[in-house]
């Protein structure tokens, strides 16, 4: 397979992945928000592009257990980095430079409306 064909196939997978991520995470009890940030959210599409995913999940699980659960659930066939905060952690981190940058550039995929 040529590099161009490989790139085209990977870009197709990249472009299908956000919908799949939403399908999987919207079913998970307690997930309140899912967004993309980073190179994909900024429009980059090549073999070096990964998906940077921010998840806000209302759960009592510890951070490593949250991440382990999310990575095992999110089988999307592309490179992916996941950041997961509880709602309290998300509120606490909003004023920190990293999360401020993420929120400026994010593409919101899913947000649970308050009941």
Regions found by a protein language model. Give the residues of each.
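Structural signature of the urease/amidohydrolase superfamily beta/alpha-barrel
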Residues: 52-53
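Catalytic core of pol beta-like nucleotidyltransferases
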Residues: 1-33, 41-48, 57-115
């Amino acid at each position: 397979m040529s590099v161009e064909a490989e790139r085209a196939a990977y870009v197709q997978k990249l472009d299908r992945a956000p919908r799949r991520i939403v399908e999987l995470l919207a079913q998970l009890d307690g997930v309140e928000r899912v967004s993309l940030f980073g190179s994909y959210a900024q429009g980059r599409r090549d073999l070096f592009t990964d998906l940077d995913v921010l998840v806000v999940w209302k759960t009592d699980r510890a951070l490593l257990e949250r991440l382990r659960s999310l990575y095992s659930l999110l089988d999307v066939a592309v490179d992916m980095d996941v950041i997961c905060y509880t709602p309290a952690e998300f509120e606490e981190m909003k004023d920190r430079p990293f999360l401020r940058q993420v929120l400026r550039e994010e593409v919101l995929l899913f947000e649970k409306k308050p009941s």
